[in-house]
């Protein structure tokens, strides 16, 4: 009779493990979304900045040579890259609000 009680009690212990696993999966998915966002920002922001500066801002509004337009656009893209990297490092160092992990045994 005691083995049946142990089996019945052990069967109910699976629910907290499943809830804990779902919590870990949710945290992993949130981390994945954050890293994916910053990767896309680091890749696409400088490219977008280069072409916006070159095509819309510098060529149309300023009367400067093509080489200077390319140089200014490249400098703008590098600045945009550094801003994106700085945002990523800031987020990684200080973390998101409420992301303090608690130790569970």
From Swiss-Prot:
Subcellular location: Endoplasmic reticulum membrane; Endoplasmic reticulum-Golgi intermediate compartment membrane; Cytoplasmic vesicle, COPII-coated vesicle membrane
GO BP annotations, alphabetical order: vacuolar proton-transporting V-type ATPase complex assembly
The organism's place on the tree of life at top rank: Eukaryota
Keyword Endoplasmic reticulum: yes
Region (Disordered): 1-26
Residues spanning the membrane: 37-57, 69-89
Segments on the Cytoplasmic side according to the record's topology features: 1-36, 90-105
Keywords noted in UniProt: Cytoplasmic vesicle, Endoplasmic reticulum, Membrane, Transmembrane, Transmembrane helix
Residue ranges that the UniProt entry lists as topological domain Lumenal: 58-68
GO cellular component terms attached to this protein's record: endoplasmic reticulum membrane; endoplasmic reticulum-Golgi intermediate compartment membrane; ER to Golgi transport vesicle membrane
Primary location group: endoplasmic reticulum
Membrane topology classification: Multi-pass membrane protein
One Pfam family per UniProt: VMA21
Similarity section: Belongs to the VMA21 family.
Function in brief: Required for the assembly of the V0 complex of the vacuolar ATPase (V-ATPase) in the endoplasmic reticulum.
Name the record gives this protein: Vacuolar ATPase assembly integral membrane protein VMA21 homolog
Organism: Drosophila simulans (Fruit fly)
Organism phylogeny: Eukaryota, Metazoa, Ecdysozoa, Arthropoda, Hexapoda
């Amino acid at each position: 009779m005691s083995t049946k009680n142990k089996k019945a009690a052990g069967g109910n212990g699976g629910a907290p493990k499943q809830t804990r696993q779902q919590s870990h999966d949710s945290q992993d998915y949130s981390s994945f979304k954050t890293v994916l966002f910053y990767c896309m920002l680091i890749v696409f922001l400088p490219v977008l900045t280069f072409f916006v500066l070159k095509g819309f801002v510098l060529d149309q509004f300023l009367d400067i040579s093509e080489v200077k337009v390319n140089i200014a656009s490249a400098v703008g893209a590098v600045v945009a890259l550094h801003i994106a990297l700085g945002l990523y490092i800031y987020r990684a160092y200080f973390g998101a609000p409420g992301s303090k992990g608690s130790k569970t045994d």
